[in-house]
Amino acid sequence: VKFIGDKSHFSLDLQNLMIENEESSKDRDGMVLNIAMNYGSRDEIVRAVKNISTDVKSGKIDVENIDEALFSNYLYTAGQPDPDLIIRPSGEYRISNFMLWQAAYTEFVIMNKLWPDFEKSDLDEAINIYSQRNRRFGGV
């Protein structure tokens, strides 16, 4: 379990609960469940740029070493692979400020169902649709 987003606006009790949950599952193998709370990708990117700038000013990193991999390490999802699939409920064809950097080569499946009504059969359908895709990772 990984909570992504600006946690500073939550109560200390809730922040501590998030930390406890992340700690209790950090050594597990397999998939990571990202729970986005107070998350906005533009904010995430601005925060990453500020933190990189601070580390450049302090001499921790050299400007010449800034690349996509280093930048990714400053995001909330540092250390995780980019998502293969994002399921977009509600039938909306928009990204809604969600994982703008990480979703560069992600496949999207748009489901015409609201999130509260989403069922296992919908997940199965989305995975089936995804499994039939020919992923090109930006290629033609």
Set out the residue ranges of the language-model regions.
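Flexible, compositionally biased loop and terminal segments
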Residues: V1-V140
